[in-house]
Amino acid sequence: MTIQPQLHHVALTVSDLETSVDWYTDLFGFAELVRDEHTEGGGHAVVIGKPDWSMFVVLNHHPTNQGETFDPTRTGLDHVGFTVSDRTELLEWEHRLADKGVKHSPITDHDWGSSLNFRDPDDMQLQLVAFGQN
């Protein structure tokens, strides 16, 4: 038997918890699901996502965070990708990002579909992907 897990959530360390909570909930329409204190080392976490918990993002703030800028070229996270239904929805997202003042790449077409990149308040790269024909 082959067991293939599915990605359920991602946890990000952010420099300003409230700024990130506001940004992600406003842009993606996520709900705030839980606020929690870390049991080890202090700090706080806010879980945002779909109300049914089928997909969520954990935003963490650690008291030892010195406000370093995210760097995708270092070992660790490169980017976080979200899927959309098709290229038409990707175009809608391109307009939504522009309307909210979020800088973004142009839509790039690939053999496998299309993508669009942008960054969050901590400069973490996010990607929207539409699989299938362009």
PLM regions and their residue ranges:
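Localized chelating/binding microdomains
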Residues: 26-28, 83, 92, 101
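Short, conserved charged micro-motifs
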Residues: 19, 88-92
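N-terminal beta-strand motif that seeds the catalytic metal site of vicinal oxygen chelate
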Residues: 1-19, 77-82, 132-134
